[in-house]
A protein has these predicted regions:
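C-terminal interaction segment
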Residues: 1-43, 47-97
Length: 97
């Protein structure tokens, strides 16, 4: 996978990841949501998760055509049992442990 600078410059990697997990920060939040997310959707990445460590929260999206649809939003100690792209249970508050 390409690093952020290469992806921003428009270079293309071979293949598409099954999952992108983007850690939000105040400095890059707008870029992550309004630039990075649509780029991965256009590339065909089936799963995109946004992680907000400040809340803490996880918002998961699944590809529907060429855009993402939100499939889950969990905060704090609330568990989420993801099925795709693989089975895993996530508790946002425990991401900081």
């Amino acid at each position: 996978m390409l690093d952020q600078r290469e992806w921003t410059l428009g270079m293309v990697a071979d293949g598409v990841p099954e999952l992108v997990i983007e850690i939000l920060s105040p400095n890059t939040r707008l870029v992550d949501v309004f630039l990075t997310m649509p780029r991965f959707a256009r590339a065909g990445c089936p799963s995109f998760w946004l992680v907000n460590l400040e809340m803490p929260a996880v918002t998961a999206y699944a590809l529907d055509g060429d855009t993402y649809c939100q499939i889950a939003h969990v905060t704090g100690e609330q568990p989420w049992a993801a099925v795709l792209p693989f089975a895993v249970t996530i508790v946002p508050a425990r991401l900081l442990d």
